[in-house]
Amino acid sequence: MEMNMFILPDFLQIQIESFRRFLHNCIFEELSKFPIIYDSNQGIEFKLIPEKYLLTEPLFTEREAVYKFTTYSSDLYVPIQLTLTKEKKSRIQTVCLGSLPLMTPQGTFVINGVSWTIVNQILRNPGIYYVLNRNGMYTATILCLDVDKRLRLEIDKKGRLSVRINNRHKIPLVFLLIALGLDINDIPDWLQSRTKKLEDLLSGLKNEGERTLELIALYKQLPGPKKVKPKANPLIISEQIQQWCAQVYKLGTSGRLNLNRRLNLNFSKSNDSLLPQDLIAAAELLVKMSLLHPGPKGGKDSSDDIDHLKNKHVISVAEMLRKQLSLCLIDLQIQVRRAIRRGISSKRILSPRSMMISRPLTQMFNQFFGSHELIQFLDQTNPLAEMAHKRKLSLLGPGGLTRRTASFRTRDIHPSHYGRICTIETSEGMNAGVIPSLSICARVDSEGVIENPLHKIGGNIKEQYTVYVRAGRDERLKIGTNNCLAIGQKGQERSTSTQYQQEFVSMSWDQINLRSILPIQYFAIGASLIPFLEHNDATRTLMGSSMQRQAVPLVKPEKSIVGTGIEAHISLDSGTVLISLKDGKIKYVDGKQIVLVDKDNVQQKFNLITYERSNNGTCIHQRPTVKIGFSVRKGQLLADGSATVGGELALGKNVLVAYMPWEGYNFEDAVLISDRLVNEDIYTSIHIQRYEISVQENIEGFDIITREIPHVDKYLLRHLDYRGIIKIGAWVEPGDVLVGKLAPLEAPHLLRSPEGKLLQAIFGVQAITTRESCLKLPAGGTGRVIDVRWIEQQGPSGVSSLHVYILQKRKIQVGDKVAGRHGNKGVVSRILPREDMPYMQDGTPIDMVLSPLGVPSRMNVGQLFECLLGLAGSYLNNHYRIMPFDERFEREASRKLVFSELYKARKFTGYPWLFEPNSPGKSSLFDGRTGEIFEQSITVGKAYMMKLIHMVDEKIHARSSGPYALVTQQPLRGRSNKGGQRVGEMEVWAFEGFGAAYMLQEILTIKSDHVKGRSQVRGAIVAKESIPKPIDPPDCFRLLIRELRCLGIEIKHTIISEKNFFLDQKPI
């Protein structure tokens, strides 16, 4: 594809275009494949009319589906023709096959009120691949459309050929060819000579009885359920083997083209099954490769690079949904055949609608969205996290790799990834390298091939245009990487870095065919947001891109002074901002809607999203940016999102930072901050928590929602209305009742007996038939109630639920995690009064003190360029959008730009300390406590720092008493289990070093797993007595003894002397 001008593609194109292709093409193609079902005995014919299928409009919008906890879907209607051939009657009815989940304009699926996304999968193309194994021998692997089905041709050291089915069963290749129906005389002589014990095999095959047994043995080795008789005809068995191979070993169009190209064959695209001629040609090439390149060091040029992107394709949303639709239609065939048999036996009049007992489409897609491992809970921490999640790729999943089997070679960067898959952004840990991201300019075509845009270089301007190039087609082209100048400083033409044949070489500019369009086109959107990216280590850049996705939207967002220029494009494609769809004038604006009137006096209303909870508990909110009477053009910004300012992405704040030590409070990446960040809500964020309680019917009766809750303090019920539900707008604290609920309880047996009823009548005792099961606010949930929703579940269960939404404003505090865009992260260690913070020469106090030791060892110098340029921009009131790799224009371009802007700020403000020639970028600071000047000059600047979602409110935890493990009788661990902190080996050493013997004894025994000791200590504390010493061993010692007994080792003790020795001898 050629284009004269290049613009950044829609970042959601990989999701939306794929789903559009599914709606417009895949549904019709799958419905067209549905066979005509014909019952010859009764003369009934059943067929679909795919040309007239319909998709209804959804009952709810995507926002209503989220609010009502339902699925955003559309019903699929297909006309069905039922013909009675004997009676010559035909009837056509439009039948609903079920509900099809729809994709929202933001590229997500709303299932039961929750946003989900489908991660695109990378799989190897079907075809044949020759690989050199560890023994120095070539193998040929034939992959089919179903990746689990494969054939492997092997050749041993003696040159004998065999085939291995699904990596398990190994048989001679000649025998498989004969079983597939090939005559012995049609097998080439060279292949017969490379078969082990060929004469015995041929003699056995000539004998009909032995041939039948051999075929049966082969047929049983094939995967899948099979039934065969011992005395079956060998021709029938051979036909069954051929049918099995035709069904299982489907190559598809791409697989057939791959085989034709690699083996020099000429079969039609429609012939997509594996043929005996394919196996013969594959074996012939395998023999030639083994003869030409023998030994473990030979043949690397002839083998296929299985990690090259030309041998892989992307399984997108369309292919996954298409597979589910095909499975649904298979179930429909079975259902129709059963309905025909059932209708014939019961002598009922059949109709298309009566034959559709269930909706197979709904069941199949519910199962798919509920269990598939590539359907993931959408990360909605901020717009960047949402966008990056939709552009992820996965090598895992059905037919793919696993975390444990993925090799280092598979995880590593391949030369074909450049410009297509980001070389930096990937998951950390076990998923490193197997969960990459799509590059910022790359796109996926309808065949699942990743394409990279390049600019063609010609003699004149008309011959220069942009083309999208597939992987593999660019290997013979010379591609300039666009990261350095073609002309040196002295005017001579110099060589430039060029990508050629999977290598980076230096060439002169006149030899280059294509060049890259943008310096950042090799990276994903997260890494592309990092300014001065080229000055950072790749590991820190990876951390910076991942931590940007963890930044929480702030109450007062602020766009960065220093950026890269794609912030507006990300916020626009994420759908968080509101854009005008036509020219017009603003007639009305408030916090919930905007009314626009166009030139034809037609009103258009835009409903704003207000305080909506995301999947991660952050706040989704839109703020109007226009006023009444404003004239707007089509495409102009009407409202900002929760993490955008002026249509640009704004994840953090520009704060004044200093790189210096301060009394050890910024040791090991700790961060010292000013109380100004707390008092002025600089880093205050809004979080919305959802608490729910179910209301259902059980054996004893219905649950009751009421305000009259016995034995509960009335103060805790103060915010409930007359129904027993919390009032909207109430300020609630931990322990408050949100929903008053009484669950039915079966009366005790004694009270239901005649004696019990007599006692109730005499003494007036009422039987307790309910128990309190209220929804109470847990610890750390203080906030304001903003919404209460009653959700009624459809279906036979009849379980309804109440959802209470509580909004919290969280200020930054000690223990919260903050980070920059360059992988510089830290935890707030102390909040100082602003008068105690170091201050600049103009009296401005520092907002944040960072450790200077975090820069040289991490090699992320980009943060220094950013903070110095930000300081100059704050005084000049400028914002900078700098594309990375600016050294392609001039040597030391970044340093020169920063110093020149600092010099401009010095001249503009008259502050000479902003740029001192002896120590550029540094200035003297004063100690806020003493007023004395620090001895050394200190780097000071405006850095863009973000507050991450790892907040101390959700992590801090303490345990007084709690649950214990059943086997070891030791306390559980984790905040969710109300667990304790483990005292490990090194902690025991610390206690021993301080001589805390009694504390150590308590921790290891009565506070841990000494069951009797726990109860004795509790009784002693209640009785105010001294804590007794434990006599019995703890349960961990008993567990050790039992485990040793399982190994056949018995532990006993022997009393050496009984003098003054008392021992209670009990079995352990």
Curated annotation (Swiss-Prot):
User: Care to name a GO molecular-function term for this sequence?
Assistant: DNA binding
Q: What is its main location?
A: plastid
- Name its GO BP terms in alphabetical order: DNA-templated transcription
Q: Name one Pfam family in it.
A: RNA_pol_Rpb2_6
Record keywords: Transferase included?
Answer: yes
What InterPro entries would the database entry show? DNA-dir_RNA_pol_bsu_ext_1_sf, DNA-dir_RNA_pol_su2, DNA-dir_RNAP_su2_dom, DNA-dir_RNAP_su2_hyb_sf, RNA_pol_bsu_bac, RNA_pol_bsu_CS, RNA_pol_bsu_protrusion, RNA_pol_Rpb2_2
Q: Does the keyword Membrane apply?
A: no
Q: Tell me its EC number(s), please.
A: 2.7.7.6
Subcellular localization? Plastid, Chloroplast
The domain of life is Eukaryota
What is the catalytic activity of this protein?
RNA(n) + a ribonucleoside 5'-triphosphate = RNA(n+1) + diphosphate
The top EC class, named as a word, is transferase
Subunit structure, as described in the record: In plastids the minimal PEP RNA polymerase catalytic core is composed of four subunits: alpha, beta, beta', and beta''. When a (nuclear-encoded) sigma factor is associated with the core the holoenzyme is formed, which can initiate transcription.
Protein family (similarity comment): Belongs to the RNA polymerase beta chain family.
Biological role stated in the UniProt entry: DNA-dependent RNA polymerase catalyzes the transcription of DNA into RNA using the four ribonucleoside triphosphates as substrates.
Q: HAMAP family in the record, alphabetically?
A: RNApol_bact_RpoB (MF_01321)
Q: Under what name is this protein listed?
A: DNA-directed RNA polymerase subunit beta
This protein's species is: Staurastrum punctulatum
